Swiss-Prot record:
Protein residues bound to S-adenosyl-L-methionine: 73, 127-128, 143
Alphabetically ordered keywords of this record: Cytoplasm, Methyltransferase, rRNA processing, S-adenosyl-L-methionine, Transferase
UniProt protein name: Ribosomal RNA small subunit methyltransferase G
Organism this protein belongs to: Methylobacterium sp. (strain 4-46)
Pfam families from the UniProt entry: GidB (PF02527)
Amino acid sequence: MVPSDRDRVLAEAGVSRETAAALDLYVAQLTRWQAIKNLVGPATLPDVWTRHIADSLQLLDAAPQARTWLDLGSGAGIPGLILAIAGVRNRPDLRVDLVESNARKGAFLQETARLTGAPARIHVARIERVVAGFRGVDVVCARALAPLPQLIAWTAPLLKSGTIGLFPKGREAQSELTAAREKWTFVADVIPSRTDSSAGIVRISSLSDPLP
């Protein structure tokens, strides 16, 4: 029997039965709320386990020691809520903060975090306001939110103080890195995506002040 996308993703991730059940609940919530609020691209919902679950889970391996995460523009909880659901079973001290300015999407995040028991705090606010009050977070991440130069501008106070940035990108990764280097000095690498051969996770660290 050919395994389903769900079974394959869960097997590759090596999650517990409890985590699998929590991720199933997340997918059920996403499907239910999708009819009310367009949380993800409709064409991606049939491939939710690869396009969204597996694509999010690979970020855990990009920062294996991280305990505190800040997810910007979380929307449907991708990747932040998925990371919180999956990561807490192996990392009891994990904490994920999700930032989403849309109130209805924020309501989805609140309800789904409660139902799944995810260690997530939801901030229904603008990114600039939340980032200004954060220090000491291990990782800041964002998927499908903005070009890399804008992401760096939003997160500069964190990246300059030791936080690592993890930003999934598609074919535009290298061109966005080139544009960002015209404004900032930083260390970067691109981790190949496991779910899309044309995509990668841009990892940013050691940011310094903008170039003159």
